[in-house]
């Protein structure tokens, strides 16, 4: 497989023309089996897989023979496995095909993504959770509306096959993909014309399908929106007056051509800011209410015409930039004005000008977090800490580690938000709930637990400065962290609050449209 990767880097056409023979190699399924074992031991467990611990090469040989005999009238999994077809999620055949198919298609897809990102310099796609933080730090000098969109889950399997066919020259390699998709669509639990792909489906194959599907959606839509908004008008920068405006703009752009090409991009404002994580994306644009309303109607029509998808109206919402405009993802986002002092020195005179720019103001949604902690039995609905009775059978170290892990995840995720009062309240709830859990386990009081286990117990687990124990962080860095916003880049996955809170918000919006 390493040799296949090496040849693919040298010649991308080689990997597109010779993918189908890989399905007849027994080593492919051994590699896919190892990939499954590695994925099951990672931080994102694959709950839907039940792959056998020992790989049966007899099963692999039967599978390869079935692929050779495959045609349009014969299913890939019919009468091939001793397990019933209804329990296909536990079938070793089905899991082997999913893992092997994903492993083969990931190689040209990764190469295509790398070349496309290098080729398109005017647009950088944001597809990682770490891209949320630069977006929250970004300034919005001219944007006045936000489009909150959600990519539809349901998609016809033939469309996925055709999108792969655009950039894979080896057409026979897509036959197993078509068989897998149609077998999944025709299953008893999924009898419908389309299949469901979503980022929350915790399998390697469907996560790969979702990433490819979302990549196709945004790689076409976002550059189209950028060109549309750039062609409307040029930004007037920070000129305080409008006298002879067109002449000044032409003069500056002509000078920029002679001096530096980068100055053109400084003057021309793209008027659009885009970020996506999972199925939800935010687009900050500049325009009138009528223009934003047209965009709301354009996005569903665009998906319907190009991707053959029907999107519910509530999946595209618009908000005006205001104090509390949106929530993404797990943050309560507001917009505040940030003044910038500019000094302009001219011969004999000095001008001082205040420029006002808008920036996001993310705060901790303490009410929603308390509701989440109440559902998990850490506190009641009013935020009063209670003992976690389900953990009383664990050891003291396990209880402390679990509470510490929860607090560390909250601290990492919301460390860059404005206002730490919400974080301190979460820390108080978790620390007191931990103390009550230990007291309930030992059948004593909180005071006795503190006295027996020592005063350093909770200080070690819930220390505020424990994130800066590394020698790379000096005392000045710790002091600066109390004043400035610091985003932690070691977040393994999105906070569970984001998904639970977003479900509530989607339900509220859907109810408004149904009324």
Swiss-Prot record:
GO terms for cellular component: chloroplast. InterPro entries: Domain_X, Maturase_MatK, Maturase_MatK_N. It is found in: Plastid, Chloroplast. Keywords: Chloroplast, mRNA processing, Plastid, RNA-binding, tRNA processing. The keyword Chloroplast applies. HAMAP family: MatK. This is Maturase K.
């Amino acid at each position: 497989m390493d040799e296949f990767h090496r040849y693919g880097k040298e010649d991308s056409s080689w990997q597109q023309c010779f993918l189908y023979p890989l399905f007849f190699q027994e080593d492919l399924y051994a590699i896919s089996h190892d990939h499954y074992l590695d994925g099951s031991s990672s931080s994102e467990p694959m709950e839907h897989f039940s792959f056998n611990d020992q790989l049966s090469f007899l099963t692999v040989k039967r599978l390869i023979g079935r692929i050779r005999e495959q045609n349009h009238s014969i299913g890939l999994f019919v009468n091939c496995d001793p397990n019933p077809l209804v329990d296909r999620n536990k079938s070793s055949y089905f899991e082997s095909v999913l893992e092997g198919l994903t492993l083969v298609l990931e190689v040209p897809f990764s190469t295509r993504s790398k070349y496309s990102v290098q080729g398109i310099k005017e647009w950088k796609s944001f597809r990682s959770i770490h891209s949320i933080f630069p977006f929250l730090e970004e300034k919005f000098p001219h944007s006045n509306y936000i489009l909150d969109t959600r990519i539809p889950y349901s998609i016809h399997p033939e469309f996925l096959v055709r999108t792969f066919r655009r950039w894979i020259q080896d057409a026979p390699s897509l036959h197993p993909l078509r068989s897998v998709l149609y077998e999944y669509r025709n299953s008893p639990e999924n009898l419908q014309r389309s299949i469901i792909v979503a980022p929350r489906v915790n399998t390697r194959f469907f996560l790969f399908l979702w990433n490819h599907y979302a990549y196709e959606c945004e790689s076409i839509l976002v550059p189209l929106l950028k060109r549309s908004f750039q062609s409307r008008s040029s930004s007037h920068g920070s000129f305080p007056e409008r006298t002879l405006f067109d002449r000044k703009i032409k003069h500056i752009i002509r000078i920029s051509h002679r001096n530096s090409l980068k100055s053109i991009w400084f003057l021309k404002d793209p008027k659009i800011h885009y970020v996506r994580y999972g199925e939800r994306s935010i687009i900050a644009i500049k325009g009138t209410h009528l223009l934003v309303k047209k965009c709301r109607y354009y996005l569903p029509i665009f998906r319907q015409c190009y991707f053959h998808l029907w999107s519910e109206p509530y999946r595209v919402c618009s908000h005006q930039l205001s104090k509390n405009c949106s929530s993404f993802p797990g943050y309560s986002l507001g917009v505040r004005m940030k003044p910038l002092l500019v000094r302009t020195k001219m011969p004999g005179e000095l001008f001082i000008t205040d420029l006002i720019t808008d920036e996001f103001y993310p705060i901790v949604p303490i009410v929603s977090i308390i509701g989440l902690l109440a559902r998990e039995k850490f506190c009641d609905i009013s935020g009063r800490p209670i003992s976690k009775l389900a953990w009383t059978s664990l050891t003291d170290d396990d209880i402390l580690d679990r509470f510490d892990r929860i607090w560390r995840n909250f601290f990492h995720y919301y460390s860059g938000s404005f206002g730490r009062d919400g974080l301190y309240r979460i820390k108080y709830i978790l620390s007191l709930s931990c103390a009550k859990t230990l007291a309930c386990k030992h059948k004593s009081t909180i005071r006795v637990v503190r006295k027996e286990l020592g005063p350093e117990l909770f200080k070690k687990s819930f220390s505020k400065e424990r994130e800066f124990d590394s020698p790379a962080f000096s005392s000045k860095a710790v002091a600066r962290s109390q004043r400035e916003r610091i985003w932690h880049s070691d977040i393994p996955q999105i906070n569970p609050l984001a998904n639970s809170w977003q479900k509530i918000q989607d339900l509220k919006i859907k109810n408004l449209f149904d009324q």
